[in-house]
Amino acid sequence: MELFREILKLNKKYNLIENNDTIVVGFSGGPDSVFLVEMLKKLQYFFNFKIYLVHINHLLRGEDADSDENFSFEYAKKNNLEIFIKRIPVKEIAKEVGKTLEEVGREERYKFFSEIYEKVGANKIATAHNKDDQIETFLFRLIRGTSLQGLEGIKIKNNNIIRPISEIYKKDILEYLNKNEIQYKIDKTNFENEFTRNSIRLNLIPFIEERYNIKFKDKIFSLIEEIRENNQNNSLNLSNYTDSENRIILEKIKFLSDFDKKNLLSLFLNQKNIEVNRNKIDEINSLIKSNGTKKIDLDKSYRIVKDYTHLYIEEKKENFTIVNRVVKLKIPSEQIFDDFKISVNIVKNLDIPKKKNQYLLDALYNDIIEVRYRKEGDRIFLDEKHSKKIKEVFIDQKIPKDMRDRLPIFLYNNKIFWIYNVKKAYIPKINKNESKLIKVLITVEEVK
């Protein structure tokens, strides 16, 4: 009962679980996840909320993994809980994308959580991180190099992700389960030194406890709490410096001191769980002061990009290659062009709000509108006599270089009339069949 009081206390402090919540729980069948669900079931006597379990078989441990999967299914059945199970070939994916098993496992895990989250209409994801995980994460980040924000450990509440047992030690969890004869599975890889975190758990912490201080973990957790309080008191409000697309607005931070800028950058990266050291923060700070569009790799998955007005994080993808592809849209029609859905509709009501993603064109019924990417020498008309190279338009408009080859360009009668999201051109009047001209509304929606 003492442990449950700790859970209640933590829940009250951080508002982790409330009435009418729908919670997706990561369930491995191990002691931590079993203990988490047992505590959540007890919390249902105090709050009205739903629980759904998610189990992932990473196909790394053969029969052991299958045994865990079967146990998870039976546990859910016994406790009248709905469970979603998925098998993911983590080793094959890691080899294909050039990432570690841990990285791929984490990415695929949260990807599946998100899928189930949408399916059941959840508003929270609960993970079974315990107090030992907090301490191991602190040491792992300290060894690799990180910021003060990184040394906070694993956040108890991070947007929609909650960790209700994150202040309970593993030994107390095991003692509770064994005392109450609650079954669980043991992942044998937790006792192997193949993964860095396992090595910290199995070697480093026991060595320090035995040689220097038996209460080492308590001391580290006290330090984590102190760092959290310090960060909370000193941290800037990130939302004051970012736009609706979560990009840092450079104009708003130019008068901040270097100290505040670096703190802001740490907060900015930490929200995506990107771990970087002090040198990388210094490098990004120098990037902010430079001219033009530049970027820096953060890790295997992300890079940070500075353009003329913003600083933002982007996911690394395969290099984008321009293809000589032309999509021809008959008036009226609708078609997908890579990451864009393009609709061409005839309109009679001319009182249409002007939107950035729309173009109102005079054209002939059944004529063709072409869509493609830019080509060498492309020009756009500014008025009846003057045109300009699209390359120069991009420079004038300060369009980032990596975006210039991704913007759809629209042509009618072989003349460019619109660079999507950048510039609308002057269109000469059509002399022939002018009486048959109709109003055509072109709408572009990004579907990626």
Swiss-Prot record:
ATP binds at S28, G29, G30, P31, D32, S33. SMART domains: TilS_C (SM00977). Keywords: ATP-binding, Cytoplasm, Ligase, Nucleotide-binding, tRNA processing. Its EC number is 6.3.4.19. It catalyses: cytidine(34) in tRNA(Ile2) + L-lysine + ATP = lysidine(34) in tRNA(Ile2) + AMP + diphosphate + H(+). It is found in: Cytoplasm. Its main location: cytoplasm. SUPFAM superfamilies: Adenine nucleotide alpha hydrolases-like (SSF52402), PheT/TilS domain (SSF56037). GO terms for cellular component: cytoplasm. It holds the Pfam family ATP_bind_3. GO terms for biological process: tRNA modification. NCBIfam families: lysidine_TilS_C (TIGR02433), lysidine_TilS_N (TIGR02432). Belongs to the tRNA(Ile)-lysidine synthase family. Ligates lysine onto the cytidine present at position 34 of the AUA codon-specific tRNA(Ile) that contains the anticodon CAU, in an ATP-dependent manner. Cytidine is converted to lysidine, thus changing the amino acid specificity of the tRNA from methionine to isoleucine. The N-terminal region contains the highly conserved SGGXDS motif, predicted to be a P-loop motif involved in ATP binding. HAMAP family: tRNA_Ile_lys_synt. PANTHER family: TRNA(ILE)-LYSIDINE SYNTHASE-RELATED. This is tRNA(Ile)-lysidine synthase. It comes from Fusobacterium nucleatum subsp. nucleatum (strain ATCC 25586 / DSM 15643 / BCRC 10681 / CIP 101130 / JCM 8532 / KCTC 2640 / LMG 13131 / VPI 4355). The gene is tilS.
